[in-house]
Amino acid sequence: LPELRNKTDALEDKRVTFDNNELARSLFGERNGNLHLIEKKLNIAINIRGNDLMLQGGLPELDTAENLLNQLYGLLKDGYPIYERDVDYSIRILSGDHKAQLKPIFLDRVYIPSKKRTITPKSINQKIYIDSIREHDIVFGIGPAGTGKTYLAMAMAISSLMKKEIDRVVLARPAVEAGEKLGFLPGDLYEKVNPYLRPLYDALHDMMDFESGSRLIQRGIIEVAPLAFMRGRTLNDSFIILDEAQNSTPEQMKMFLTRLGFSSKTVITGDITQIDLPEGKSSGLIQARNLLANIKGIKFVYFGREDVVRHPLVQEIIDAYEKAET
């Protein structure tokens, strides 16, 4: 690492030892890919000597690397497989909070029986979000795209449905472009609402096979609908998700929140920096945040760029564009 060796700061050395050959190899990754990623992200050098790693770099980075390696090794001991994306998420977590514990985050599982798969949080805020949904009847997830707000809410909803904790899942989105007046659009109802709701269908079909999902939709057990279709209803024994809530008006948000019936949960997700409402219209999500933040039983969870769960190249592309624009 030329940048490392050219630094004028004093370089320090640390040795990290692992007692299990097989787990050490898993930790290092295929072709030592996990170690190369740690070198790149933390700007340190790592030399392998059997089960020992010799780390060289600045002291804060070495402390982070040692903490990271020991915690990842602990996860491997508990049977959690470590991939490069896990290393990447872990570096972000520990760089933001060196006291953070990875086990409670990565070993938390949302089980989806329909696909026999588990979905796990990848950041501290994602873990807080999942716990909040378990513990509260109304949860707001606010933050940028790609932070898992809708996906995790959907996972919790489908998991609850499969475990028969609820009878129905309702997924809603404001249809901003149509001003929620779908009569302006040609075609039948499905054709009218489908473009606005496609992202919700995509997330749904990622969690259950197409036939099962379609069958549940036809039976009304899973409902995907524009926000306007919630008016006048009371939803009992349901898990209700409002996506893109920043594009709801205050009237629509009030209408939506008062649909909540007995034994139901609702999760509202949105990004208050991406409001597409017509000029002069205020966001129902912003008003709800201002009015409801102190009500017991309602939880607000905020996500940041550090929670973005994407292909590493996507993050680099975003960074490159942001750099060019400043």
Label each PLM-derived region with a short phrase.
Residues 113-242, 246-326:
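Conserved helicase motor core of SF1/SF2 NTP-dependent helicases
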Residues 1-9, 326:
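Acidic, low-complexity intrinsically disordered tails
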Residues 23-40:
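Short amphipathic alpha-helix segments
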Residues 96-124:
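Conserved loop-to-helix interface motifs that mediate assembly, gating, or partner/ligand docking
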Residues 47-106:
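Interdomain "pre-motor" coupling segment immediately N-terminal to P-loop NTPase/helicase cores
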Residues 40-47:
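A short, structured beta-strand/loop element
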Residues 6-26:
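Short glycine-/aliphatic-rich beta-strand segments at the starts of folded cytosolic domains
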Residues 18-20, 48-50, 57, 173, ...:
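Flexible glycine-/small-residue-rich
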